[in-house]
């Protein structure tokens, strides 16, 4: 089965709550079929049998974590919620470490002869790491050739000599890049061989029976946790309990303002079908994916602001340069509060989150960096 089909099957649902899709076939001209269909519809439910358990770790900085392996994968596979603490995003540390230490006896290939999903992910992570190293090597090689050209110019070289040297350098860089591409697979195989050797510190990862300790957990952003308990009844805590963990009961509006604004933005894009992930990697609040990280790169970087806040040009230009360098679109998301601060904090303390979040209005502006050489019209 191809990678695309595997992902389509694995990430079938965009949210942890699934639609009711086990209803019987409806025969239009048969009244009994209508009655049976209505009965099954009335009895069906899409509520989770066992809600996801979360733990709160830390005093000064609160970490909201999910410890159970199955629940971690469930949240990731159904909406890409959370981040593995020892992984890039999906919590794959356990599978990667078991494979490296030879603890997993499950065959890595399925009946079709293709690689399993776990092995594919491990290979991709290794390839990504290797490509980062190769990019550094390529930059060093390019800088070396640029120094040669600079030396020629300092010596007063003729223009024809420069052209000949430039052509040689371009050809040298092409061959260097081609060699790097061929070396990716070889290096990955060498890593597989070298990683099979146990290190001294690996003994600390195993319990008395030789099984891998469950060290990795899935960490949720506060806004993700609120969404999974307020918008969707997925977590085993209530919105009021979560709010009490995040802020003290006597909190002022200025204490909760940043969180409320961030959640309003998060809920806004989730409700429009976007997969929302943390954007700290690109200096913004959120990244927006059409489906999720396994399918394509994020298209938009979102920065949340109050509707009456204006930054200087340097602030906008700095973020736009980072976002533009990653080939993404920069979105300024302005949030306006429609009620007073006193009313907002009163709604928060009374746990009336529905009315509180509905009292904010969201507006968006696409920011595009103006380049004189490209924007002449």
UniProtKB/Swiss-Prot annotation:
In this protein, the active site sits at 289, 297, 328
Pfam families membership: tRNA_int_endo
- Supply the CDD domains for this chain: tRNA-intron_lyase_C (cd22363)
Residues annotated as coiled-coil are 119-174
Record GO terms (molecular function)? lyase activity; nucleic acid binding; tRNA-intron endonuclease activity
| Annotated keywords | Coiled coil, Lyase, Membrane, Mitochondrion, Mitochondrion outer membrane, Nucleus, tRNA processing
Q: Where in the cell is it found?
A: Nucleus; Endomembrane system; Mitochondrion outer membrane
Q: Which GO terms describe its cellular component?
A: cytoplasm; endomembrane system; mitochondrial outer membrane; mitochondrion; peroxisome; tRNA-intron endonuclease complex
Q: What is its EC number?
A: 4.6.1.16
One GO BP annotation here?
Answer: tRNA processing
- Please name every pair of cysteines joined by a disulfide bond in this record: none
Instruction: Read off the SUPFAM superfamilies from this record.
Output: tRNA-intron endonuclease catalytic domain-like
Determine the domain of life of the protein's source. Answer: Eukaryota
Q: Which InterPro entries match?
A: tRNA_endonuc-like_dom_sf, tRNA_intron_Endo_cat-like_sf, tRNA_intron_Endonuc_cat-like, tRNA_splic, tRNA_splic_SEN2
So what does this thing catalyse? pretRNA = a 3'-half-tRNA molecule with a 5'-OH end + a 5'-half-tRNA molecule with a 2',3'-cyclic phosphate end + an intron with a 2',3'-cyclic phosphate and a 5'-hydroxyl terminus
According to its UniProt record, where is this protein mainly located?
A: nucleus
Give the bilayer topology: Peripheral membrane protein
Q: What else is known?
A: The tRNA splicing endonuclease complex is present with 100 molecules/cell. Present with 319 molecules/cell in log phase SD medium.
Q: How does it assemble?
A: Heterotetramer composed of SEN2, SEN15, SEN34 and SEN54. Interacts directly with SEN54.
- What family does this belong to? Belongs to the tRNA-intron endonuclease family.
Q: Which PANTHER family match?
A: TRNA-SPLICING ENDONUCLEASE SUBUNIT SEN2 (PTHR21227:SF0)
What task does this protein carry out?
Answer: Constitutes one of the two catalytic subunit of the tRNA-splicing endonuclease complex, a complex responsible for identification and cleavage of the splice sites in pre-tRNA. It cleaves pre-tRNA at the 5'- and 3'-splice sites to release the intron. The products are an intron and two tRNA half-molecules bearing 2',3'-cyclic phosphate and 5'-OH termini. There are no conserved sequences at the splice sites, but the intron is invariably located at the same site in the gene, placing the splice sites an invariant distance from the constant structural features of the tRNA body.
Q: What name does the UniProt record give this protein?
A: tRNA-splicing endonuclease subunit SEN2
Q: Which organism is it from?
A: Saccharomyces cerevisiae (strain ATCC 204508 / S288c) (Baker's yeast)
């Amino acid at each position: 089965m191809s990678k695309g089909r595997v992902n389509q099957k694995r990430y079938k649902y965009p949210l942890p709550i699934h639609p009711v899709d086990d209803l019987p076939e409806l025969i239009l001209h048969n009244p009994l079929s209508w009655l049976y269909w209505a009965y099954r519809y009335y009895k069906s439910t899409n509520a989770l049998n066992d809600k996801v358990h979360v733990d709160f770790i830390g005093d000064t900085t609160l970490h909201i974590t999910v410890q159970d392996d199955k629940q971690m994968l469930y949240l990731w596979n159904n909406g890409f919620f959370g981040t593995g603490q020892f992984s890039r995003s999906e919590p794959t540390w356990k599978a990667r470490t078991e494979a490296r230490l030879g603890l997993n006896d499950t065959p890595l290939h399925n009946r079709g002869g293709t690689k399993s999903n776990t092995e594919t992910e491990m290979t991709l992570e290794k390839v990504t790491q290797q490509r980062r190293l190769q990019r550094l090597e390529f930059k060093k090689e390019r800088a070396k050739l640029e120094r040669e050209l600079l030396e020629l110019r300092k010596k007063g070289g003729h223009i024809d000599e420069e052209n000949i040297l430039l052509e040689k350098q371009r050809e040298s860089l092409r061959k260097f890049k081609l060699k790097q591409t061929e070396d990716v697979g070889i290096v990955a195989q060498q890593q597989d061989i070298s990683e099979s050797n146990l290190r001294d510190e690996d003994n600390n990862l195993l319990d008395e029976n030789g099984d891998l300790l469950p060290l990795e957990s899935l960490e949720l952003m506060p806004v993700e946790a609120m969404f999974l308990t307020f918008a969707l009844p997925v977590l085993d805590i209530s919105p009021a309990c979560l709010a009490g963990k995040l802020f003290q009961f006597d909190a002022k509006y200025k204490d909760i303002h940043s969180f409320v604004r961030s959640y309003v933005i998060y809920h806004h894009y989730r409700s429009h079908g976007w997969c929302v992930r943390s954007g700290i990697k690109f200096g913004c609040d959120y990244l927006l994916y059409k489906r999720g990280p396994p399918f394509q790169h994020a298209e938009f970087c979102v920065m949340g602001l109050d509707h009456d806040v204006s930054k200087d040009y340097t602030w906008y230009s700095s973020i736009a340069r980072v976002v533009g360098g990653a080939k993404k679109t920069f979105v300024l998301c302005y949030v306006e509060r429609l009620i007073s601060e006193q009313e907002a904090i009163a709604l928060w303390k009374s746990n009336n989150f529905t009315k509180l979040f509905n009292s904010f209005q969201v507006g968006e502006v696409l920011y595009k960096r103006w380049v004189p050489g490209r924007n002449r019209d």
